[in-house]
Amino acid sequence: MQALSERLDALLAGATLRKADLLGFSSLKTYAPAPDDLRGHRLEHVTRRAKYLVWDFDDSNRIVLHLSQAGRLDIEEPPKKTKPRGAVARFVFGQGDAGLDGPGIGLLVREYGTQRKASWWVLGPGDEGPLVGLGPEPGTDEFANLIRTSDSKRQLTTDLRDQHVVSGIGRGWGDDILQRAHLSPFASLRSLTPEQREALITAANDVMAEALDLERKRKGGLSESSLGGRFKVHGKVGEPCPECGTKLERVSFESYEMAYCPSCQTSGKKLADRRLSRLLK
């Protein structure tokens, strides 16, 4: 998401918002300010906080966008007027001094799959909206201090997915981080030794830094939906562990699955697959 925000900033910073079309009614989570209130204002910069894209305008209003798991951004030059399947919103910007004139450039937010979870907010000055209460991110002193001192009893996979505990990781990178740290996803922060806590800090920092470096090198559009090739463990069930070669296993939940290496993470033990256990009852 950091690399995406950097590409958007390079593309659109300084451009004027011509219009913001709501294409998926339930995706907009605020009613005031209205999207039209930003029309004619200049986009100053695009940044990121956790899994959210933050667009700051010259009137101190902002748009916050969350693509969720299956969202993507498509550049349209010139902007289109169609409403493709899964369309969430379309933003049209005027470039340079053209301002509100000329065809400009369109940015289509589109969601693939059956679930509709992509969301956006229009926030007034001082309103943090969904950014309130987000946890620290890997690579920061706050993150390292949290890992070193937390006595959380929750499973590591749960804490790493909870954006209000640790932000910017999520389930995909969480699988890769726990394998790199040689930690069971069902262990808790409270149960870790000081050495294991340091291993988790190092793994999180390294995995996220490597992911950002790779994404910055990627060419093409602005899609964030095709991250399968970025992960080394997540989504690779049945394939060999990138470190030891052991077949990666899964634990299935209602709406997602978690991948892990039995040799690297659980001393050879296979964790109970929740979905399979229910079927066998």
Q: What are these model-derived regions, one by one?
A:
Residues I63-L183, S188, L200:
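Phosphate/anion-contacting hairpin/loop surfaces
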Residues M1-R116, R278-K281:
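Gly/Gly-Pro- and Ser/Thr-rich, intrinsically disordered tail segments characteristic of DNA damage-repair
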